[in-house]
Amino acid sequence: MNHVLIENSGHTFDVRPSQTVLEAAIEAGINLPYGCRNGACGACKGKILTGKVMHDDYQGSALTDAELSAGMALFCCARPLEDLVIECRQIDMVQGIKPRILPVRIQHKEQLSDDVMVLHLQLPGTEQLTFMAGQYIEFLLKDGRRRAFSIANAPHEKGFIELHIRKIAGGHFTEQVFNEMPVKTILRIEAPLGSFFLREQNEKPIIMVAGGTGFAPVKGMIEHMIFNQINRPVYLYRGARQAADLYMDDLCQRWAQFMPNIQYIPVISDGNNGDNWDGRRGLVHQAVLEDHADLSGFEVYVCGAPGMVDIAKQTFVAQGLPEEEFYSDAFTFAPK
């Protein structure tokens, strides 16, 4: 067993040989930032000040060779070879909210488009799930694999969990959900997970950018804000290939109609002039850049494909956004 000291906070925890640094930190109740937990998003990146680690497989875009040479590590993939002293951010807002393993029952299935289904999971009657708006769950499958999905409802909605599932061609789990898994099926989950959640203590206006089912955590955040009368200005940008891919568009339109602090800007990238679309066209991050010449006064949440998240971060920071005000959740597809 190896010992880890977080230098900037003084917190310590032990790591068993079978664990990554992140797994051990979560078990110890120490909240490091993280997203995908499989080396794809880079949210858990920090610095090794002393000691050595071995990395599991990860994507080069999440940790470059130059960063690795400079002593950076992805804590979701890093396994200590000796005692460590590390430097990383910690998240105070989720202190006291530890992930738990729970049984859930499929309560309701509703297909919203060719490849998106809403899944309502019912919790046991004696259980309540405490979470932050925007966090995610993981299904624990019988073969040992895990599948992660963002929570789409707000924390005040008790007793159930809403998920938005995109069907992935050849994807074992999502094809089961769409084609084989009936209502009343019992599954196991671990929840809540992730450091992508609404920072309620900030008072800056918010830009939210959602691609595809990246809308799920954004929906939870906005409904949480409405319920708690958090009236900060919100600019909601949704990106999709075609207008038909903007599921729950009517809900977003209602938010913008009845909530004066919410503006809704849907953007499609692959439509043509004969598709009856009279809204914005192009790339969703580019629409943000066109509308906001100076991003220095904003807080930004981006959720969707890793490529979209990466280019959004690069260009938004270049346009004045403080890097610490950029929060993201990159949706990566698990191996089939």
What are these regions (language model features)?
Residues K98-I186, K204, A240-Q242, V267-G271:
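Ferredoxin-reductase
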Residues M1-A78, L84, P233-K336:
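Reductase modules of NAD(P)H-dependent flavoproteins
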Residues A191-N202:
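A short, basic/flexible loop-to-alpha-helix module at the beginning of a structural domain
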Residues A73-G96, T185-L187:
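Short, structured interface segments
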Residues L49-K52, R89-I91, K142, P192:
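Short, surface-exposed secondary-structure boundary micro-motifs
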Residues K219-F227:
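Histidine-anchored nucleotide/phosphate-binding helix
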Residues G134, G214, A305:
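Short, conserved phosphate/pyrophosphate- and ester-handling motifs at nucleotide-, phospho-/glycolipid
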